Amino acid sequence: MKNLISFFDRSKGKWISQRTTYELSNKNMSSVQSQMTMKIGNSLSGSIILASLNWGDIYRQVAHYAKNHSRSEYDNKFNLQFGNQLNNHKLLTLCIVTDPSLISFKTRYGSTTIDETYWFATNNLRLSTSIVKRFNTCVAVSFCSEIKV
Protein backbone atom coordinates (compact mmCIF):
# COMPACT_ATOMS: atom_id res chain seq x y z
CA MET A 1 0.00 0.00 0.00
CA LYS A 2 2.93 2.34 0.71
CA ASN A 3 4.16 2.18 -2.92
CA LEU A 4 0.63 2.81 -4.23
CA ILE A 5 0.17 5.92 -2.10
CA SER A 6 3.68 7.09 -3.01
CA PHE A 7 2.89 6.75 -6.74
CA PHE A 8 -0.27 8.86 -6.44
CA ASP A 9 1.54 11.36 -4.22
CA ARG A 10 4.17 11.85 -6.96
CA SER A 11 1.33 12.33 -9.44
CA LYS A 12 -0.26 15.29 -7.64
CA GLY A 13 -0.57 18.48 -9.63
CA LYS A 14 -1.34 19.65 -13.14
CA TRP A 15 -0.18 17.62 -16.15
CA ILE A 16 -0.24 18.12 -19.93
CA SER A 17 -0.92 14.87 -21.75
CA GLN A 18 -0.32 13.66 -25.32
CA ARG A 19 -2.05 10.35 -26.13
CA THR A 20 -1.93 8.41 -29.39
CA THR A 21 -4.44 5.59 -29.88
CA TYR A 22 -4.49 2.93 -32.59
CA GLU A 23 -7.70 1.04 -33.36
CA LEU A 24 -6.52 -2.19 -34.94
CA SER A 25 -9.75 -3.34 -36.62
CA ASN A 26 -10.15 -0.27 -38.83
CA LYS A 27 -6.51 0.92 -38.69
CA ASN A 28 -7.52 4.33 -37.36
CA MET A 29 -5.08 6.45 -35.41
CA SER A 30 -6.00 9.41 -33.25
CA SER A 31 -3.88 11.77 -31.22
CA VAL A 32 -5.27 13.91 -28.42
CA GLN A 33 -3.67 16.52 -26.23
CA SER A 34 -5.30 17.34 -22.89
CA GLN A 35 -4.72 18.69 -19.42
CA MET A 36 -5.26 16.78 -16.20
CA THR A 37 -5.27 17.79 -12.54
CA MET A 38 -4.70 15.20 -9.83
CA LYS A 39 -5.50 15.68 -6.15
CA ILE A 40 -5.14 13.38 -3.16
CA GLY A 41 -8.41 12.83 -1.29
CA ASN A 42 -9.54 12.06 2.24
CA SER A 43 -10.76 8.91 3.94
CA LEU A 44 -14.52 8.32 3.68
CA SER A 45 -16.61 5.53 5.29
CA GLY A 46 -14.00 2.77 5.32
CA SER A 47 -12.43 3.83 2.04
CA ILE A 48 -9.37 5.84 1.17
CA ILE A 49 -9.76 8.21 -1.76
CA LEU A 50 -6.34 7.74 -3.33
CA ALA A 51 -6.75 10.22 -6.14
CA SER A 52 -9.19 12.45 -7.96
CA LEU A 53 -8.35 13.00 -11.61
CA ASN A 54 -9.83 15.71 -13.81
CA TRP A 55 -9.55 15.69 -17.62
CA GLY A 56 -11.76 18.60 -18.62
CA ASP A 57 -15.34 17.32 -18.20
CA ILE A 58 -14.24 13.81 -17.22
CA TYR A 59 -13.80 13.14 -13.54
CA ARG A 60 -12.43 9.86 -12.19
CA GLN A 61 -12.01 8.94 -8.54
CA VAL A 62 -9.79 6.12 -7.31
CA ALA A 63 -10.81 4.55 -3.99
CA HIS A 64 -9.32 1.69 -1.99
CA TYR A 65 -11.80 -0.09 0.29
CA ALA A 66 -9.57 -1.36 3.08
CA LYS A 67 -12.30 -3.40 4.78
CA ASN A 68 -12.79 -5.49 1.61
CA HIS A 69 -9.08 -6.10 1.07
CA SER A 70 -7.76 -9.39 2.35
CA ARG A 71 -4.01 -9.20 2.85
CA SER A 72 -2.07 -11.89 1.09
CA GLU A 73 1.59 -12.82 1.11
CA TYR A 74 2.02 -10.27 -1.70
CA ASP A 75 1.46 -6.74 -0.49
CA ASN A 76 1.59 -5.24 -3.99
CA LYS A 77 -1.87 -6.18 -5.35
CA PHE A 78 -5.02 -4.24 -4.54
CA ASN A 79 -8.60 -4.13 -5.72
CA LEU A 80 -9.54 -0.54 -6.46
CA GLN A 81 -12.86 0.98 -7.42
CA PHE A 82 -13.11 3.61 -10.14
CA GLY A 83 -16.05 5.97 -10.25
CA ASN A 84 -16.79 8.65 -12.79
CA GLN A 85 -19.34 11.31 -13.63
CA LEU A 86 -20.17 9.94 -17.08
CA ASN A 87 -22.39 7.17 -15.71
CA ASN A 88 -23.19 5.42 -12.45
CA HIS A 89 -21.05 2.36 -13.17
CA LYS A 90 -18.37 1.44 -10.66
CA LEU A 91 -15.53 -0.54 -12.19
CA LEU A 92 -13.53 -2.94 -10.05
CA THR A 93 -9.87 -2.85 -11.03
CA LEU A 94 -6.92 -5.01 -10.05
CA CYS A 95 -3.96 -2.77 -9.26
CA ILE A 96 -0.39 -4.07 -9.14
CA VAL A 97 2.36 -1.83 -7.82
CA THR A 98 5.87 -3.10 -7.16
CA ASP A 99 7.67 0.19 -6.57
CA PRO A 100 6.76 3.91 -6.27
CA SER A 101 7.56 4.55 -9.96
CA LEU A 102 5.41 1.87 -11.66
CA ILE A 103 1.74 0.96 -11.41
CA SER A 104 -0.45 -1.39 -13.49
CA PHE A 105 -4.24 -1.63 -13.71
CA LYS A 106 -6.34 -4.48 -15.09
CA THR A 107 -10.04 -3.66 -15.55
CA ARG A 108 -12.70 -6.05 -16.81
CA TYR A 109 -16.08 -4.84 -17.98
CA GLY A 110 -18.15 -7.59 -19.59
CA SER A 111 -16.12 -9.07 -22.45
CA THR A 112 -13.69 -6.14 -22.47
CA THR A 113 -10.35 -6.09 -20.61
CA ILE A 114 -8.16 -3.00 -20.30
CA ASP A 115 -4.51 -3.34 -19.23
CA GLU A 116 -2.86 -0.04 -18.29
CA THR A 117 0.73 0.56 -17.14
CA TYR A 118 2.02 3.92 -15.88
CA TRP A 119 5.59 4.74 -14.92
CA PHE A 120 7.73 7.76 -14.13
CA ALA A 121 10.65 8.30 -16.51
CA THR A 122 11.65 11.33 -14.39
CA ASN A 123 9.90 13.28 -11.62
CA ASN A 124 8.03 15.45 -14.14
CA LEU A 125 7.62 12.95 -17.02
CA ARG A 126 5.18 10.05 -16.76
CA LEU A 127 4.57 7.52 -19.55
CA SER A 128 1.79 5.00 -20.04
CA THR A 129 0.54 2.26 -22.33
CA SER A 130 -2.96 0.83 -22.59
CA ILE A 131 -4.15 -2.33 -24.32
CA VAL A 132 -7.86 -2.91 -24.90
CA LYS A 133 -9.00 -6.47 -25.57
CA ARG A 134 -12.45 -7.73 -26.48
CA PHE A 135 -13.00 -11.49 -26.18
CA ASN A 136 -9.21 -11.82 -25.58
CA THR A 137 -8.43 -10.18 -28.94
CA CYS A 138 -6.51 -6.90 -28.99
CA VAL A 139 -8.69 -4.16 -30.51
CA ALA A 140 -6.78 -1.00 -29.53
CA VAL A 141 -3.47 0.18 -28.10
CA SER A 142 -2.56 3.55 -26.69
CA PHE A 143 0.67 5.34 -25.80
CA CYS A 144 0.79 8.44 -23.64
CA SER A 145 3.33 10.91 -22.30
CA GLU A 146 2.49 13.40 -19.56
CA ILE A 147 4.54 16.40 -18.46
CA LYS A 148 4.02 18.01 -15.06
CA VAL A 149 3.57 21.79 -15.26
UniProtKB/Swiss-Prot annotation:
Q: What class of enzyme is it?
A: lyase
Which keywords does this chain's UniProt record carry? Chloroplast, Lyase, Plastid
GO molecular function terms noted in the UniProt entry? lyase activity
Function field: Might function to covalently attach a chromophore to Cys residue(s) of phycobiliproteins.
User: Which superkingdom does the taxonomy of this entry point to?
Assistant: Eukaryota
Q: Which family does it belong to?
A: Belongs to the CpcS/CpeS biliprotein lyase family.
Output this protein's name.
Chromophore lyase CpcS/CpeS homolog
InterPro entries found in the cross-reference section:
Calycin, CpcS/CpeS
Return the GO cellular component terms, semicolon-separated.
chloroplast
Q: Where in the cell is it found?
A: Plastid, Chloroplast
Task: Note the HAMAP family from the entry.
Answer: Chrphore_lyase_CpxS
Native source organism of the sequence: Pyropia yezoensis (Susabi-nori)
- Known EC number(s)? 4.-.-.-
